[in-house]
A protein has these predicted regions:
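Short Gly/Thr/Asp-enriched flexible loops that form oxyanion-binding sites at enzyme active sites
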Residues: 26, 57, 76-89, 122-123
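ATP/NTP phosphate-donor binding region
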Residues: 1-67
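Predominant activation on well-ordered alpha-helical scaffold segments within soluble catalytic domains
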Residues: 28, 39, 54-57, 81-84, ...
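Glycine/serine-rich anion-binding loops at beta->alpha junctions
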Residues: 65-83, 114-120
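Catalytic cores of large soluble enzymes that bind and process phosphate-bearing ligands
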Residues: 19, 45-48, 75, 160, ...
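A glycine/threonine-rich phosphate-anchoring loop and its flanking beta-alpha core
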Residues: 88-177
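General beta-strand structural signal in soluble alpha/beta enzymes
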Residues: 16, 40-42, 69, 79, ...
Length: 177
């Protein structure tokens, strides 16, 4: 919240999933206290498709957001990262699928992970499911690396034990790679 206040960023899009939302009361209270207007995106409750992403992107554009706050697992964080990169630019998402095709990012971006598997909060990658061919496609660009990543232990408690176990094993396999 301090990072947003220091930069006088007031219109903040929060990208998260439905299960995480009840845990964010403290965060919303802090944002309100800092004078921020909280804009909630449509929830990212599954692997994000291009259509789900485009709905979030449209909300960001309609609300003229100044910053994006991603809270959740890899899916929510990937959507937050892409939204921050494409909200003010003219590039369509299908044009940036691939490596180093993203032209930049104008919005300040903070990610708060609730899981440990993907590392999305610090990576230059984002994954979307393309409904046209049912293939997962990636965007790889240094412009996707968030300005800040904040790990809050209490947010990890919002995740069901089975998801914690699965993402923990995912993190372990990444270490072994």
């Amino acid at each position: 919240v301090e990072l947003l206040a220091q930069r006088r960023l007031r219109r903040v899009l929060v990208v998260t999933s439905t299960p995480v939302l009840p845990q964010l009361g403290f965060l919303f209270e802090a944002l309100n206290h800092a004078g921020c207007v909280i804009i909630s995106s449509p929830p990212v409750d599954q692997e994000p498709t291009v259509a789900i992403f485009e709905g979030v992107l449209q909300k960001a554009r309609d609300e003229a957001v100044e910053a994006v706050l991603g809270v959740g697992g890899g899916s929510a964080l990937d959507v937050a990262k892409l939204t921050a990169a494409l909200a003010r630019g003219g590039q369509p998402v299908r044009e940036v699928l691939g490596i180093n095709l993203l032209q930049g990012r104008d919005l300040f971006l903070v990610c708060l992970p609730t899981t440990s598997g993907t590392g999305s909060e610090v990576s230059p990658n984002a994954i979307l499911l393309d409904e046209t061919d049912q293939m997962k496609k990636g965007v790889v660009s240094p412009h996707l690396v968030p300005d800040a990543a904040v790990v809050d232990l209490f947010l990890t408690l919002s995740v069901p034990p089975a998801v914690t176990a699965a993402t923990g094993l995912d993190a372990l396999t990444h270490c072994l790679d």
